[in-house]
Amino acid sequence: MKKRIKELTDLLNRYRYDYYTKDAPSVSDSDYDKLYRELVTLEQSYPEYVLQDSPTQQVGGTILKGFEKYRHQYPLFSLQDAFSREELDAFDKRVKAEFPNATYLAELKIDGLSISLSYENGFLQVGATRGDGNIGENITENIKKIKDIPYQLSEPLTITVRGEAYMSRQSFKAINEARQENGETEFANPRNAAAGTLRQLDTSVVAKRQLATFLYQEASPTARNQQNEVLAELADLGFSVNPYYQLTSSMDEIWDFIKTIEAKRDQLAYDIDGVVIKVNSLAMQEELGFTVKAPRWAIAYKFPAEEKEAEILSVDWTVGRTGVVTPTANLTPVQLAGTTVSRATLHNVDYIAEKDIRIGDTVIVYKAGDIIPAVLNVVMSKRNQQEVMLIPKLCPSCGSELVHFEDEVALRCINPLCPSLIQRSLEHFASRDAMNITGLGPAIVEKLFLAGFVHDVADIYQLTKEDFMQLDGIKEKSADKLLAAIEASKSNSAEKLLFGLGIRHIGSKVSRLILEVYGDISALLTAKEEEIARIDGLGSTIAQSLTQYFEQKTAAILVDELKTAGVNMHYSGQKVNSDAALFGLTVVLTGKLNQLNRNEAKDKLEALGAKVTGSVSKKTDLVIAGSDAGSKLEKAKSLGIRIEDEDWLRQL
């Protein structure tokens, strides 16, 4: 029986590979089902012989308790966006300045969810979401339910690969039809449906919804030299690889490819929202390196957003957590990019004045970044006698006088006791990307605030079961869950807490960069603006905002209250030594190194506090030049930049 189970497992896995990866079925569905049923029967009778890569282990379902956080060994960076031919030409110019003979590979930008798959000796170990690029969620059990993801590779490799999980238009249509029949809310678009599916706790639901994938990157070190070779290897290993791509050195040919794909976009079985252009040489990619947010060797051209006409019925003014007052237009409903849109942002008062937007106007509405509905401009030919919009002088929440600073485009309420400002700050603190206090959403925050139970974020940690029980609609079980979520948030990473404080210009990535240097939020109470500005990726604006916040007496009180409540203040990641020899310096490696390989040299520089970049500019502080150094060395000399060799680096 053991031998037969092995035969069936190997045979069925080969059939799955032919069907899902090669798109060339080598057996009829009925024959496959017959063999599959035989394997199921044998495995039920002899469970001790069930193999790790059995296809039966990738179907069925279990109920998961939740998803654990997963720190990516290789960070997932965002891509720089481009919306015009001019931006692509500028990218081409930057690359060709370093590598005149560079070629590009243009690939489809799948409108799905980024995933990372890690294999050990050929077997799938971890499937994870992108998250913030450094920390995602471990969704391995759900990943196993996606039929075109191989549980075992065709070779016993230890490798980490990247790609997109998506839902086909056909599957999306079928799911929404079923949800409509069951009286359930329909998904807005395939991307939302795929996102909701990957976060399902019931893995059988994932299996039924028939997600699919396209893989496009080997994140771990590879023996391949070119990106097109990587795609070929991924296909050989058993992954699904998108068949549409263009290899060329000409931006004219790239543009022709983009226009060809855009024209057939609606004919594809899945949604795409652009084309990604990558430098094809992996060695050149390594030389070009990364900015804080994105690789310098790739750019994502985004297709123009769909636009529709709608009438502005009224305008609401709302106060955000930093006091910014944002205008939102209420519209006649329109279908836009798969969703019904009845509200759209007007951005700020300067935008309203610039576009001369008035209530009653017919306007062009689009989705900024394919996500946020926004008003593009007014259809002047349809304007009648609309009056100029009245801009509020007083805060719609607290009645305080609004200010419009010269260097800002927004109206701002500067009353620290403004109810809306406080509520938005509390909501932000409890949000998923900040302290992730499950259940503590806007409705409950509002009830707590109006009841007088919370006035700042530290008050959240003083709440009792009796406090929650006094709120309308909160029962004992809900109160217990909320208290448990609050307690659990105390052990969150310190960067989540710093982000949760809602300091202007301090996002989640900036929070991590700051704490890599300072190590503890308490240390920020005495941090100097000039020190913060030296941190790679920050600058004077962020430094000023951070120091202004922590110089307030209320900040010291808040930090003390949070610490007393047991909230984690300490950064658990690897701390950067601000006393390191090269701290704050921007360094470029060029030429051939004799003793160290490039990764070893980069690791050493970063350990010494340096930021390693791929190109020489006026911002470069130091160039480490090996043998056969070319244009980068010459440019460094022309700019008067300090130059050292490999021996100097090794002695540090």
Swiss-Prot record:
A Gene Ontology cellular-component term: cytosol
Biological processes annotated in GO: DNA repair; DNA replication
Origin superkingdom: Bacteria
Binding positions for NAD(+) per the UniProt entry: 29-33, 78-79, 107, 130, 164, 278, 302
Keyword DNA repair applies: yes
Residue ranges annotated for the BRCT domain, each copy included: 577-652
DNA damage among keywords: yes
Active site: 109
InterPro entries: BRCT_dom, BRCT_dom_sf, DisA/LigA_HHH, DNA_ligase, DNA_ligase_AS, DNA_ligase_CS, DNAligase_adenylation, DNAligase_N
Requisite cofactors: Mg(2+); Mn(2+)
Keywords carried by this UniProt record: DNA damage, DNA repair, DNA replication, Ligase, Magnesium, Manganese, Metal-binding, NAD, Zinc
Any one Pfam family match given in the protein's UniProt record, by short name: BRCT
EC category: ligase
Record-linked Gene3D superfamilies: 5' to 3' exonuclease, C-terminal subdomain (1.10.150.20), 6.20.10.30, BRCT domain (3.40.50.10190), DNA ligase/mRNA capping enzyme (3.30.470.30), Helix hairpin bin (1.10.287.610), Nucleic acid-binding proteins (2.40.50.140)
Catalytic activities: NAD(+) + (deoxyribonucleotide)n-3'-hydroxyl + 5'-phospho-(deoxyribonucleotide)m = (deoxyribonucleotide)n+m + AMP + beta-nicotinamide D-nucleotide
Sites where the protein binds Zn(2+): 395, 398, 413, 418
EC numbers, comma separated: 6.5.1.2
GO molecular function: DNA binding; DNA ligase (NAD+) activity; metal ion binding
Function of the protein: DNA ligase that catalyzes the formation of phosphodiester linkages between 5'-phosphoryl and 3'-hydroxyl groups in double-stranded DNA using NAD as a coenzyme and as the energy source for the reaction. It is essential for DNA replication and repair of damaged DNA.
HAMAP family cross-referenced by the UniProt entry: DNA_ligase_A
Family of the protein in this entry: Belongs to the NAD-dependent DNA ligase family. LigA subfamily.
Name of this chain's protein: DNA ligase
Organism: Streptococcus pyogenes serotype M1
